[in-house]
């Protein structure tokens, strides 16, 4: 899914630091890499069922070794079924319940991280990911797949909120945006990694090993976290001044006195009423600082309207139909190379994300978002026509273009604009609301697409094109330019 993340707002600040006040140390690089592996886990789970879903669900049988029965393989000898019978609706449910877990995880993530710390919360989520991944790998039933997908969804939904908090808090002044962009890039890398592993393993004998890959990543991430220091800002916010200084010394490579000076600056920030870490909002439905109060506040109507349309609309343009079901879509016209083509589409996604991360800070929001949305509408329409008329080459070319033009604007900008149209005191609740909208939109597409596509075929992309066209009109009339000059 693509976008789900309130953390994408960090892309708005991507720029090279004006001065090398703080160098990037090996310890800091290691901490950023370890944290970013959580984003890779998110991308991996988001698309892990894309390539193998046909052989997983007994819809197709691809036997890699003729004359060698499955019962004689390592998996077959240990009682793992060759496939799990699933219809289109069940495939949609197994894919989409990841989003249910994601909503739960992202909703409570900030509270978890503020109480237990960024490091310990990440360890909890890695543990949950390990358990969920093992359940998915070992599952011989529809129910087992659902349970595992919900668990990894909770883990990934939480990680995708905690990771940007950690990176923002450990990054030296001037580097926050550049390092923060790692979240989005690593999500795309996770998707690419899944498709790369799927190239040799998508057949009726070995598809489970694709699912096992997420277990290995989670285990690696879990043990790597033990060498990472806790966020010094979180430590200071909890009164652990000495620990904060030591953490800052290790991460930044500064002396104890230099760390003490920066800690003193942070303490002055706290005393001035400016929160050092992202505040926790009330988790109750009807509390004084709750999401329900935000939804009822009439002063937020215009900004909330913009957030709702952009964050739902981002998903209803259909991009996750490619991320979640791209192999099945392309295989209808080009079955021999569908997985390979999907891999290269994911590679384009990574490259465009890196380019956008470097340039987006210098471009105005509204024209870029308009351009991206209009091009998404045009390319989705052409993809629909190509599918309906069996134009294989046209479908492949415009699948690449569709992914590229979405990534250049409609992917990151709704999250950036979400922050910029909100009042400062409502920003945390606005992010939470927007993230929920995005998760719900992803759930709807993940669940309904295989069912609707089975009935409408290419016409489903024409529907996406009409929705994207409508969103373009909304952006033109209702969305303000939020980028400040300078």
From Swiss-Prot:
Keywords on record: Membrane, Mitochondrion, Protein transport, Repeat, Transmembrane, Transmembrane helix, Transport
Extent of the signal sequence: none
Mitochondrial intermembrane side: 48-90, 141-146, 200-208, 327-342, 388-396, 454
Transmembrane segments: 27-47, 91-111, 120-140, 147-167, 179-199, 209-229, 306-326, 343-363, 367-387, 397-417, 433-453, 455-475
Cytoplasmic side: 1-26, 112-119, 168-178, 230-305, 364-366, 418-432, 476-486
Topology class, membrane: Multi-pass membrane protein
GO biological process: monosaccharide transmembrane transport; protein targeting to vacuole; transmembrane transport
GO MF entries: hexose transmembrane transporter activity; transmembrane transporter activity
Family matches, as Pfam families: Sugar_tr
CDD domains: MFS_GLUT_Class1_2_like
Cellular component GO terms held in the UniProt record: fungal-type vacuole membrane; membrane; mitochondrial membrane; mitochondrion
Role this protein plays: May be involved in vacuolar protein sorting.
Family affiliation: Belongs to the major facilitator superfamily. Sugar transporter (TC 2.A.1.1) family.
Protein's name in the database: Vacuolar protein sorting-associated protein 73
Gene that this polypeptide is encoded by: VPS73
């Amino acid at each position: 899914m693509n976008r789900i993340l309130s953390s994408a707002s960090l892309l708005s600040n991507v720029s090279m630091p004006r001065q090398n006040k703080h160098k990037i140390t090996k310890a800091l690089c290691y901490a950023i890499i370890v944290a970013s592996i959580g984003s890779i886990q998110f991308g991996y789970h988001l698309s892990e069922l894309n390539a193998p879903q046909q052989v997983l669900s007994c819809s197709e049988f691809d036997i890699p070794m003729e004359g060698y029965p499955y019962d004689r393989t390592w998996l077959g000898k240990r009682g793992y079924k060759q496939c799990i019978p699933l219809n289109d609706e069940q495939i949609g449910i197994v894919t989409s319940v990841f989003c249910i877990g994601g909503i739960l995880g992202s909703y409570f993530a900030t509270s978890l991280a503020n109480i237990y710390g960024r490091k310990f919360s990440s360890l909890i989520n890695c543990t949950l990911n390990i358990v969920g991944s093992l359940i998915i790998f070992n599952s011989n039933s529809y129910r087992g797949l659902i349970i595992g997908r919900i668990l990894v969804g909770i883990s990934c939904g939480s990680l995708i909120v905690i990771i940007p908090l950690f990176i923002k808090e450990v990054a030296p002044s001037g580097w926050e945006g550049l390092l923060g962009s790692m979240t989005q890039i690593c999500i795309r890398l996770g998707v690419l990694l899944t498709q790369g592993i799927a190239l040799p393993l998508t057949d009726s004998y070995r598809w489970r090993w694709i699912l096992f890959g997420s277990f290995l990543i989670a285990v690696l991430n879990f043990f790597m976290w033990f060498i990472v220091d806790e966020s010094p800002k979180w430590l200071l916010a909890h009164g652990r001044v000495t620990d904060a200084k030591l953490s800052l010394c290790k991460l930044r490579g500064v002396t104890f006195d230099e760390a003490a000076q920066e800690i003193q600056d942070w303490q002055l920030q706290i005393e001035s009423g400016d929160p050092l870490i992202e505040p926790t909002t009330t988790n109750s439905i009807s509390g004084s600082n709750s999401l329900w109060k935000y939804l009822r506040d009439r002063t937020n109507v215009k900004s909330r309207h913009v957030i709702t349309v952009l964050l739902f609309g981002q998903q209803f343009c259909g991009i996750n139909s490619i991320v979640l079901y791209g192999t099945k879509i392309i295989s209808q016209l080009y079955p021999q190379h569908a997985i390979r083509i999907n891999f290269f589409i994911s590679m384009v996604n990574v490259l465009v994300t890196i380019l956008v991360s470097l340039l987006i800070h210098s471009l105005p929001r509204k024209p870029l978002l308009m351009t991206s949305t209009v091009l998404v509408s045009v390319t989705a329409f052409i993809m629909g026509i190509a599918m309906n008329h069996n134009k294989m080459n046209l479908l492949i070319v415009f699948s690449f273009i569709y992914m590229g033009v979405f990534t250049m604007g409609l992917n990151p900008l709704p999250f950036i604009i979400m922050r910029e149209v909100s009042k400062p005191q409502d920003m945390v609740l606005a992010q939470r609301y927007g993230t929920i909208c995005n998760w719900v939109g992803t759930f709807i597409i993940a669940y309904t697409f295989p069912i609707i596509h089975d009935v409408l075929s290419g016409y489903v992309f024409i529907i996406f094109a009409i929705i994207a066209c409508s969103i373009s009109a909304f952006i033109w009339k209702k969305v303000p330019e939020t980028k400040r000059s300078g």
